[in-house]
Regions:
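Active-site recognition of the HExxH zinc-binding catalytic motif
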Residues: 10, 148, 253, 258-278, ...
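Short acidic (Asp/Glu) and glycine-rich catalytic loops that position anionic groups and cofactors
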Residues: 24-31, 88-90, 190-191, 243, ...
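A well-structured
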Residues: 1-163
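Short, well-ordered alpha-helical packing segments
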Residues: 7, 11-14, 51, 114, ...
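Post-HExxH zinc-binding segment in Zn-dependent metallohydrolases
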Residues: 287-303
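A glycine- and charged-residue-rich anion-binding loop/surface
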Residues: 217-218, 222, 273-276, 283-284
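Alpha-helix N-cap/helix-initiation motif
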Residues: 252-260, 283-290
């Protein structure tokens, strides 16, 4: 294998993986925003096919051989290429430990869970969602045992979201925060309460949407690449690359501040993602480096 050709194959592989991620992400986004209520099973069927193809591409012999070759020649790669290879090998090793049928079933489960959660929230019926939530917990615990049997499942997933983080580190950090935050909260609660009547009233959705658009422009978001939709619980997602960011909010007629802060928070996520270098689009280096950094950016703007 010629190194220059292998590097080109590396970029092609990542573009294909990004395309599958784009399609699967769009299914999730559609389900959480505008999809009709009765279409979850339809999306789940499509998700199962896409996730199976994604699994096969990720763990296939050609992919493994390519990355093993590049890893053996990593001294000849630049820093970005080395990181791409490292992250892809890490993903492959984890995915190889999870049976394909279980991986595909889990992707279908998430589509089902999102649909059930929306129905349960509308009626405040946790019992409706509880069985599906238990399945999600059970699956994640099982996957953690597959990938890192020597670790506590929670430590495994913590490290997946924030590389190297452990429960012990979190306990120590939160204990330090508690020492300072609890006295501060008590001090604040002892102060005269502010009159927040101005935040409550009747605020039409059209007016709140106009405020959302104003906030997004003021934050510097490129509205040609960042879209806004309504959903039950606000979130931000990248579709394919940082060139397509979708943020969502939830309007409450009697409390405009709820959506206002949601848009600022989610806008912070989108602003961070869109700051990625264009040369990294459609690679595993595109977007945020970790969940912790991502939340620090969204909270920075919201706070």
């Amino acid at each position: 294998m010629i190194l220059s050709e292998a590097i080109q194959s590396l970029m092609t592989l990542q573009a294909k993986l990004a395309a599958y991620g784009h399609a699967m992400g769009l299914l999730f986004y559609d389900g959480a925003t505008t999809a009709p209520k009765g279409t979850a099973a339809n999306r789940g069927q499509t998700m199962s096919i896409l996730s199976e193809e994604h699994y096969k591409l990720t763990t296939g012999s050609e992919t493994v051989a390519l990355l093993e070759f590049l890893d053996a020649h990593k001294a000849e790669l630049d820093e970005k290429q080395q990181r791409m290879v490292f992250l892809l090998i890490k993903d492959i090793r984890n995915m190889q430990k999870i049976p394909m049928d279980e991986y595909v079933a889990y992707q279908q489960l998430l589509v089902e869970a999102d649909d059930v959660w929306h129905r349960a929230k509308e009626t405040s019926d946790f019992a409706l969602f509880e069985p599906v939530l238990e399945k999600i917990f059970e699956t994640n615990i099982r996957f953690a045992h597959y990938c890192a049997p020597e670790k506590d499942p929670y430590d495994y997933w913590l490290s997946e979201y924030e590389d190297g983080l452990t429960m012990a580190q979190c306990d120590e950090f939160f204990a330090t925060l508690r020492e300072h935050i609890v006295p501060l909260l008590k001090k604040i609660k002892a102060q005269p309460q502010l009159d927040d009547a101005m935040l409550h009233g009747s605020f039409p959705e059209t007016a709140q949407d106009a405020l959302s658009q104003y906030l997004m422009r003021t934050m510097g978001l490129d509205l040609d690449h960042v879209g806004l939709a309504t959903t039950e619980h606000p979130f931000t997602t990248s579709l394919g690359s940082h060139f397509d960011e979708r943020i969502t909010t939830h309007y409450l007629e009697d409390n405009f501040a709820s959506s206002m802060f949601s848009v600022i928070h989610e806008g912070g996520h989108a602003l961070y993602d869109t700051g990625s270098a264009d040369e990294l689009a459609y690679t595993v280096l595109d977007g945020g480096v970790s969940m912790g950094i991502h939340e620090s950016q969204s909270r920075f703007y919201e706070n």
